From Swiss-Prot:
Organism name: Dictyostelium discoideum
Name of the featured protein: Guanine exchange factor for Rac 30
PANTHER family (alphabetical): DH DOMAIN-CONTAINING PROTEIN-RELATED, FACIOGENITAL DYSPLASIA PROTEIN
Function, as annotated: GTPase-activating protein for Rac involved in streaming and development.
Record localization: Membrane; Cytoplasmic vesicle, Phagosome membrane
MF terms in GO: GTPase activator activity; guanyl-nucleotide exchange factor activity; phosphatidylinositol-3,4,5-trisphosphate binding; small GTPase binding; zinc ion binding
Location of the DH domain: 460-638
Chief location category: membrane
Domain notes: The membrane association is mediated by the calponin-homology (CH) domain.
Residues covered by the PH domain: 940-1038, 1532-1631
Amino acid sequence: MQPKDYMSSSHANWENIQIDSFTSWINQHLSERGLSVKDLSVDFQDGVLLLNLLEILSGKKIARYVRSPKFLQHKIDNIMIAFNFMEKAFDIKVFGCNAKDIVDGNLKQTMGVIFLLIQKIKVNLHLDHLQEQQGETTGTTTTITSTNTTTTPTKPRFYRASMQVNAANRFSHISPNKDQSSSTVATTTTTSTSVVQPQPQPTTATPTTTTATTLTPPVASQQPVSTAPATVTPSTVIPTVTPLNTTTTTTTATSTSTNVPTATTNVPPTATTTTTGTRISPTTGVSVSTIRSKFLFEGGTGNTTGGNEKYNTYSPGSGNTSGVVGPSTSSSLNISSERVLKRTESGYLISGGLSLSGSGSGGIHEPLQRTVSLIEIKLNDHQSKFYDLKKIIFMQSVIRGYLVRSKWRNVLEKYKQHLNEYKKHFMNNKKAYRGLIRVQAIVKGKIQRKKLFKMFPLYRRNEIVKEILSTEDKYVTSLAMVTTHYLKPSEAFLSTQQVRSIFSQIEIIHRYNSLILEKLVSRNKIWYSSGQKIGDIFIEMSAFLKVYTIYVNNYNNSIQTITECMEIPKFASLLEKNRNQFGLDLSAFLIAPIQRIPRYILLLQDLLKNTKESHPDHQDLSLALKKMKDVAEYVNEKKREAENLNQVLTIQSSLTGKFNNLAEPHRRYVKKGTLISNDKIHLYFLFNDLLVKTENKIVSKIRDSARLSNNNSSDKNSKSTFHSPKEIINEGKSKYLNSYFLAGSSLVDSNPDGFTFQIIGVGDANELNSQINNQINNQNNNQNNNQNNNLNNNNDDSPILSFSPFSSSFASTITNSLSSIGNSNNVNNNNNTSSNSGFVNSSNNNINIVNSNGSSPLTNSGHGLNSSFGISSNNNNNLTMPTTSIQLEALSLNEKMTWMGELDECIFQLLEKSKSKKRSLITDADELTTVPFDISVVKDSEFSNVLEKKHSEISWRSKKFYLKNTHLYYHRYSSTESPKEPTKIKCINLILCSVKLAQVVDHPHCFQLITPSRIYFFSCEDSTVLFQWISLIRLSIKKKLESLKDENNNINNFTSIASATSPTSSSSNTTPIVVPIASHSNATGSLSASLGSSFLNQQQRSLEQQQHLNTSNSNLTPLALSSQVLYHINNFISTSTSTSASQSQSQSPSPSPSHSINQKQKIRKLSFYQSRSNTLININNDEDRLNSFPTSTLSVSCLLNNDNHGNNDFDGKSFTNNIDITTTTTTNDDNNNNTTTTQVKKGKDLSCSKELNCSISHDDNSKGSSGYGNNSCGDNINNDESNNNCAECGASDPSWVSINYGVVVCLDCSSIHKNLPEGNVKSVRSLSVAFSDIVKKQEGNIKANNKYEKNIPSGLTKPNPKDSYEIKLSWIKAKYINNNNNNNNSQNGDSTTPTPTPTSTTIHVNNDSTPTSPNLNSQSSPPPTATTTQTENVKLDNGRSSPTPTPTQTENNNNNVLTPTTTTTNTTTSTTTGSRPTTPTILNNEEEHIQGINLKDSTDTSNGKGTWSRGSSHAITERKTSFLDKPRVPVKKEHQGYLFKTSSPTSNNSSDWKKYLFVYKNDVLTYYKVSKKNKRKEKGIIDLFHSVKQESRPKQKYSFTLVTSQRLYFLASETEEEMKIWLDVLSSHTTH
């Protein structure tokens, strides 16, 4: 160690001085064994270095200790062994020091043990010094006598003899006291400022003595050791320094006699030297060297400076000492020389040595060292001899080697002797020789097997690959054999259906597996050069293996069909012939595809097991195995679904009586069994949404036998002796009695110990059927009466309603029936009563019949209907879903719990299905926020009870729960004896929760509450409370979901247009036409928007007007395509003809003079231009295309009546019906023009008639775009010749269409399109009229390819059908994704795109003998003065800027153009506020400019009542979008940092927030747990998050919530800046 200067201007750090001093002292001793200490607290933990130090100090060997401790107990044992050794060898008893503390690295304890060793050695040195002083002669002589010096033998002590040399100097600076001013006991230092050079004194020695060694006792800080010959030579004075700032010198006098060097360490007391007075480091002093360099020898005689340098080397430092070397006087000491000898294995060595260091001015000097090459051997008590140390060491090594070899030589000789004996034995005994050879073979074989075992996985892997290849070859061969020798020959004598039933998809399977075999064979040829990979082939082909689904589902039918076809002789002979040829039956070949996929899984599992993780194929094999398992699960799931459907069909075939269709696509069979109802046992079939009640004769007989057993037995539970349900229901057929719909129902267990339970709120199908049939019969009777009285020429029979509430055809059936009987709802039988019209919603095979005011009598999801039921009639009788409660009794308690569990699961699934439909209506705020607790919850809660909540895996805690407003509050439960106010009340938002039964071992009555963030388990006291909680929670969730109304739920509703006849003209009745029209959201349910509303009588209009005044106008609902356009037409006709006329008639008793019979015919013409994206509406002039409405269908409703006198009386007083509707459909296809006209007339021939002509013509450039005709959208796509091949690879007969890109692709490419951003594909066969928007984008593959393939890189070539998946993927990505933006820009900037030919729809309103149309301004319109033809131009604007209308010259009595509002003139429109009719503004010589309805800007003038009012703006209300609808976008930012995460955000315990490292990259947020060594361990991945909300938490101020589709993540940052960064990064993801 380099010495350190610890002194500074202030006091030194005493602790560091002690540590360094102790370390230096320990290292000086441990260096003998090549050991060292760097840190006392660490290096002494295992006790090994401490034991080595004790061995060096004591010179003894410690027998047993653990030299390489690895366990804690081993280290403690080493420390305890060291303590015991210190007590025995050094007599040091350690108190207050624990071995465990030293093992734990306690520095103070370790330094205490070292200090005890140092102090013990210092004390022993002092005692030795005192004993040696007592053995000296009384007189001190300065000469050395010639006689041998006799010494008094002393008892050897347990410390090193080397410690005698300057021991005081060595330990003086390691004092436990900080005050170093006092010197050690018996320490004498000579301090002087002058140089003393004593004169040498001659001594004589006897011839018999060679040398005499004299040891002086330790005096002061020096332990002089002197060996003097007969003659005295000048001594060498070497300065040394004590720990104090005083100057001390040590003079070494060396005398030689016969050129034999002697080691002298004796310093006379008078010999002193002086130093320059510079400060010297306290660590500078005399230290102990190794065993083999104990003493510094001087050779030769005379002065030291001229002595033998071989034995005397001097290496001073940079400074110079002021000591002067001169002769010294050595004193004769009578001390025995045994103290300086240390016994070793080879003899006595002189122990001790000097290593001096001095200092110069301003620096630290290197130590003064002298080498030792001689050693003195004590021959006897009086003689000793010096030997060369190197020679001694060499001799020792030779001797030791000889001893070791001699030891082992005997062993080897004995071993060779035994071998010779064994050899003779085996050579003479052949049996033993054979046994020896056998043993050797076993041992060698075991060794070789171990080597082979290491190479076995690779060998086994190659064998598995060969097995895959061979089995695939055999499998494809068998499929080809079935196709060639069974399928094709059987087509000659079997029907197509029979062939399809037997062989199913075996040809397609053969084609795909042939492709797999081809890839496997090609890979096997380049097996070693390809990296021995096979997993990628199965990954690529796994998606195509789903074709096995149809085959697996059809297998049972295939076997049954084979049995049936065996009656055909040709087929039987074919099977017999092939059986004899191939040795296998047809069924053996057909079972092969069923077994192939499981075989794939087994082979891949074995292959993955024998593949190392470092192998390049390991990852692909893992993925291939996963995909293969997914395929197997998919096939099995489809198999279960098919079997379930077959089970439903079987059950339906086993039922007798009148019942409806049970085999619905959504219906699944669950359970069947016997239950007791009304003291009768019945057979019940449970489906996922339906409970069917039947009667079985076998069951009845068993019931009778059960009664007898009950009478003979006193046991109340004797019913449990019934036969199992399977034994009962497998025989005979059952009679259908009733069925119950489970949607919205609840279970009640009023008797937990009994066998009975109740189902409340179930829908009764029989009651519903009877109500609907009664209602329909009444309507049919009324319709028949009306038709007999007023429609004598109409011989059409009234339709009879025949429906099935179970089938999807129920909606269409009841819709058509209601359309046919619409008249009967609105007939006025001379009672001056007006009717209401019903609105029917028919979409997605569902029906919604509501009242005219928009209310729904009942909501029920039963029998395949997911909407409300209700029909409004004159008597206000609503058709509602009848509900009832049924009480059932099981045959045993176990069977009861089984039934209740299955029923609860079905109800739970139905509620989840309805919740999923409302999911998009739930906002983030409703989902994340909870209602704060109010004390009123405790008093006014819907339900409250004490439940046990699961706190951990083994502990449950009682809590008091309150249910209110879709929130569940709970707090700690306090007993009734000591009631307390509730504290720490928590809340659970139930809006997205699910509740269902749960099975817990030690808690029998449990249910689980599933929230987005966690799952709660609750335990009830009995089953009654259990099902009560489940029912109430579900009811609360259901009410909340029903309160979420979608503003688009009334789109495409059907209304039955009602009209009332005049009280004075009872014989004049009208026949309304049912048309699709949008319903209104206002509370009055006004029908004035429809065309028929203009003919309501005065009382009805007054009633509606009064209701309108009491209610506020609401915005119109966004309409569907067809409904929106029709709404504009009807509203326009109603406004321009009927409403104002009715108003005028009601305010003026006499008809207007403008209603002249002699006026010429007036024609109103409305034209609709429909293109691929919009529809243009024009009035009078086809070229004025002023408004566009997106629509694809058109339906027109009109009802016009004239009185007998030829006057138009639009207020409904007198009408005569004559309707002429002509519908013309024109198809323009290049040069072909096809027109279809349909004309319908009803009523009598009158002198005055009104004609409504509707002609519809549309462009047929894009086939199927309009949606008309019998052909579906899929047929129209197939008719395009460019779609005969795949747009990507050119494969023939593509069957999939890409919705986003409008191309028709094959099955292989459809899987790639499906994975594109926003990719969506549909099967061409599944397309119908509902997918007309898809067809509009489909322009044909040739046009689409020309558009998308413009910017594809030149390096890519178009793939062919045989190319790999990767080639097709790269082509499709380059075609659509990389150039998507360029294509969009080019489309937006292309102004030369030709406008498609529009579809024109024209409505002609012809008034044959009508003078003019009614005047809209009844208050201020002047009477007409002339009767001339007038052409009125009316424009419907959509809020966009339009050119100023061109004035048209008109000739009329008043020359006025009727217009309610205008935006192109400076004239303001006058409006009447508060009244339904509005007075329009009369503009002279200007065309009528009417703005559109339901427009997107503030100029909308519709008030939803069929009138026009300026300022009544109705902005379009768009559908609420859920955060689930947000698409995934490419990542824009990357970020990482530490965040806190918790699952209990409301907790006040800060330890619940755990710190993780979050890394956001590629739209994925991954969080890791980082160890102290900075190693990451992945804890989870957060993907598909859609919104971020910042809100503070109790223990985290800067916290925010991350919303995903599965759960909520509560995160927090340390600073506000970090939180803002995270919010910006995550928000950039959610906004896209």
